[in-house]
Amino acid sequence: SLATIVSDRGDEVSGSDIEKYIFTQKPLEERHIPITTFSEDHIHEGDIVIIGNAFDESNPEVKKALSMDSVKTYWYHEFLGKLAKEYTSVSVAGTHGKTTTTGMLSHVMSLAAPTGYLIGDGTGEMPKDSRYFVLESCEYQRHFLAYTPEYAIITNIELDHVDYYKDM
């Protein structure tokens, strides 16, 4: 996850989510990243808040963060694009095969040099001294436009996300 990557880079990370346990929590727990339920009390002066794709301005933490000038806010895809610029990045997009391609590519690249990755199944890490970053690129709501990778792979193209895209 993006939280594990930011933690791997040495930054202090905490997060809020729904109460239901989800398998993606395990790597967060392994890194001792605290996860709490939503409360505007979690937002403080000087915080950096990354807003996940599943939440909007009606969320109490998002609402408070967006109202405070001293809190820097990023939508998930914006922060990911900013982070990717710090590495030689490879973005994997397409209708099918993104997760598999991203996983295989990051593994092969890590045999040559330290390589971070972010996969759509919620896994991600950023080994120390990483030079490369392989990310699964989400085309939903044009989020991929926030990424400026040095290399891009498109596995295939089909009509997808028909709630947003009306045609190809």
Residue ranges and their predicted role:
Residues S1-F79:
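N-terminal leader/targeting and accessory segments in enzymes
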